[in-house]
Design a protein with these regions (language model features):
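Acidic, Ser/Thr-rich peripheral helices and adjacent loops at domain boundaries
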Residues: 122-146
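Active-site phosphate/pyrophosphate-binding segments
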Residues: 1-114, 119-124, 197-207
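Membrane-targeting and insertion segments and their boundary/processing signals
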Residues: 27-34, 38, 144, 164, ...
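Short, conserved catalytic or adaptor-binding loops enriched in Gly and charged residues
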Residues: 77-81, 145-150
Length: 207
């Protein structure tokens, strides 16, 4: 596809292999591990504010949960004493106004939250700014407790455009971030034996 013909993914791969100080994938991996293991945020919420990115959360869900849903040390084979991959969920931001956002603004559980936005989608960009401003400021002065909105931590990834090259960079960042997280937790991101067992038992039922 056009995405992989461009140099976007290659650029991020080269950064991930050569540098520590200017490595977006590594920075996000460290952040996600801190959120998961130190701040006990066991879910990752991904909200996109460009229609072309409306399915990105589903891609990230498959990538991260299949790769990082492990509980065994890759070297010793022993069960790990710490948490690994989080539950990944999300969707297209404008469609999430009355579902995810109610939970995000007033729920009791916090999530490691990402906003993905492109400046080229002007209406969605304005909505993104409005929503994130609400999360930054909250409304603690509100006298009615049932109307109060929580302040939340979140990460914004702002894309200048949504070209094939930029999309390739975003995909490469997520793939490299996932690899780095598997290294921090010392798990094997390349096997899916839980999935395989399901296939085997399903085949037995069919036969």
């Amino acid at each position: 596809s056009d995405v992989y013909k461009r140099q976007g993914g290659k650029t991020i791969d080269e950064l991930s292999n050569k540098t520590v100080t200017n490595n977006p994938a590594l920075s996000l991996a460290i952040q996600d591990v801190v959120m998961n293991n130190l701040l006990n945020m066991d879910t990752t919420l991904i909200l996109s504010y460009d229609y072309k990115l409306r399915n990105f959360s589903a891609y990230a869900q498959q990538l991260e949960m299949e790769s990082l849903g492990k509980s065994v040390d890759r070297d010793t084979g022993e069960l790990l004493a710490y948490q690994t991959g989080s539950i990944v969920w999300g969707g297209y931001g404008p469609r999430s106004q009355h579902s995810f956002f109610q939970h995000l603004f007033q729920g009791t559980k916090d999530a490691n939250t990402y906003f993905l936005v492109s400046k080229t989608d002007h209406l969605n960009y304005k909505q993104f700014k409005g929503q994130t401003k609400s999360l930054i400021s909250g409304n603690e002065a509100e006298p009615d407790s049932h109307k109060k909105v929580n302040k939340r931590k979140f990460t914004s990834i702002l894309l200048e455009d949504l070209s094939a090259e930029t999309l390739g960079q975003l995909i490469a960042i997520w793939e490299n971030k996932t690899i780095f997280m598997s290294m921090f937790w010392n798990i094997n991101p390349f096997d899916q034996w839980g999935v395989e067992l399901g296939k085997i038992n399903t085949k037995k039922e069919i036969e």
